Amino acid sequence: MQLSWKDIPTVAPANDMLDIVLNRTQRKTPTVIRPGFKITRIRAFYMRKVKFTAEGFEEKFDDILKGFPNINDVHPFHRDLMDTLYEKNHYKISLAAVSRAKTLVEQVSRDYTRLLKFGQSLFQCKQLKRAALGRMATIVKKLKDPLVYLEQVRQHLGRLPSIDPNTRTLLICGYPNVGKSSFLRCITKSDVEVQPYAFTTKSLYVGHFDYKYLRFQAIDTPGILDRPTEEMNNIEMQSIYAIAHLRSCVMYFMDLSEQCGFSVEAQVKLFHSIKPLFANKSVMVVINKTDIIRPEDLDEERAKLLQTVTELPGVEIMSASCQLEDNVMNVRNKACEKLLASRIENKLKSQARITNVLNKIHVAKPQARDDVERTPYIPEEFKKLKKYDPEDPERRLLARDIEAENGGAGVFNINLKDKYILDDDEWKNDIMPEIMDGKNVYDFLDPDIAAKLQALEEEEERLEKEGFYDSDEDESYGGFDQEEIDEIREKADWIRNKQKKMIAEARNKKSLRNKAMMPRSKLVKSFGDMEKHMATLGHDMSSLQDKHRAAAEKSRYVETGADVVFGQNDSMASGSNGGKLRQSDRLLDGVADGSMRSKADRMAKLQRRQRNRDARQGEADRHATASLPKHLFSGKRGIGKSDFR
């Protein structure tokens, strides 16, 4: 349930709303259209204008209708409060006018869009667009007064305090200037204006405080005058509606000193006149300003008037002084206790809730099977035990007694392992590891582990004596002879080597996945590799070896006499080296030494710098790029986009 309305969007005046929506249409829709364009494009241009403007008005109206609360859906307290402050009928008529304007704008947009579909020229479409926007503007201008009223309501709603009608509430009421605001300032941290004249509080003020870890709200209401409800103003009606609708403890304040300007008789009369509003509520009468006069100091006539209030059932009277802060917190605590008790009582009276809870509860009670009385059994040994007495010198010493005898806590540490029950008392203080070899030691503990180990050892000795583990020499290899075993081992070695090669080949392929790979047809393959591969497969390569040798002898070069002569001439011509001339580096042929070479490199680098800055492809690149690209620096706004201007 919504308790405050501080997030309602601002309601713009009619003229401002027109400027906002029309400027938005001008900024966010295309602006260029020419008579030479296709008629379908012209129609779409102006239809977009009309629809976009209508959507802008509809969004504004939707924000208003959704932001303001529906007066029929809120709590009765808020409904009556809004009726008092803003006049319910005026509020409904204003929102209805906005809703009607939204419907009319939608209808205008729909009608003129239908007409624009049949426009014959640019001028005709433009005039239809002007007519549509003009009618929308006329509709919005008629909302001038409702929009101004709704903006004032929005501002006032945002300043209203957040009052929860269902939480624990103390409601402070009474005549003006009897000390209601002073009491609220004393029990809460709210900064309420306090003045020595009447009608200082003109609206509801809320303060919060904690009592017994529960959150309470205290509401200070404007002063009420003793007159008919029809004659009360809006300020007084706020108090009446708060008393009528809020589930609270009503604290009726009285000023017996009559400094508030109203007599005790008038204050008692007001209490009796608003008494019907106290139905189903806890009521407390608070006598304020006891620093001036106390109830005991009243004369007999006024004491009888006050007694007519206290004699009513369920009404409790207390006194306090907000000026001296005397008994203020006691009054507050008493009111809180009274409110909590009444809330619990109301919950218990609601039969529906109790019925729902009782349907879920079943109390199971055991039924007696016979009439035999079965008393609890206590062994005789326990009955004979002597009762522990700390003053008895022969008592059994407890651990704390031993600790006290040896210096007390912090000096003497009690041995917690002293009561362990083990086979050997020397084992009590042994260190027991929790983790050993990465395993939990307690998972392998067994009380009978020694007996089980001894039984296993005896069984092993018996099996060895019986020859259970002895085996014949023929059966040592599973019935295979030595030759078969050697053959199996050779095959196993071959399989292992083959697996290693396959793994190595797979790794090589994986490493070359993103690198350049030599084609299979270009790989150099020797006859020796093929011979080894075929031998591993079990093929006889003797015939292929003979053919390979014969082919190699035929291809071998045989020197003749002419070859010898040419060879000698070549060796003489090449000098003492007798080999081929090395090819020189053409980049360094024209450079004398290292210093000249570094200077040449530096000059070449300087020449490349400007070319790189201009992004030239080389020395011959003389292309002149456009300094002002025409497609970026010419033209106007197109449909749906704009240029760089």
UniProtKB/Swiss-Prot annotation:
GO biological process: one example: rRNA processing
Compositional bias segments (type: Basic and acidic residues): 612-624
Signal peptide positions on this chain: none
GO cellular component, one term: nucleolus
Superkingdom of the organism of origin: Eukaryota
Coiled coil: none
Family: Belongs to the TRAFAC class OBG-HflX-like GTPase superfamily. OBG GTPase family. NOG subfamily.
Domain OBG-type G: from-to ranges: 168-340
UniProt binding sites for GTP: 174-181, 220-224, 288-291
Species: Candida glabrata (strain ATCC 2001 / BCRC 20586 / JCM 3761 / NBRC 0622 / NRRL Y-65 / CBS 138) (Yeast)
Annotated localization: Nucleus, Nucleolus
Region (Disordered) location: 567-645
The protein's name in its UniProt record: Nucleolar GTP-binding protein 1
Keyword set, alphabetical order: GTP-binding, Nucleotide-binding, Nucleus, Ribosome biogenesis
Job of this protein: Involved in the biogenesis of the 60S ribosomal subunit.
GO molecular function: GTP binding
Pfam families, A to Z: NOG1 (PF06858), NOG1_N (PF17835), NOGCT (PF08155)
Broad class of where this protein is predominantly found: nucleus
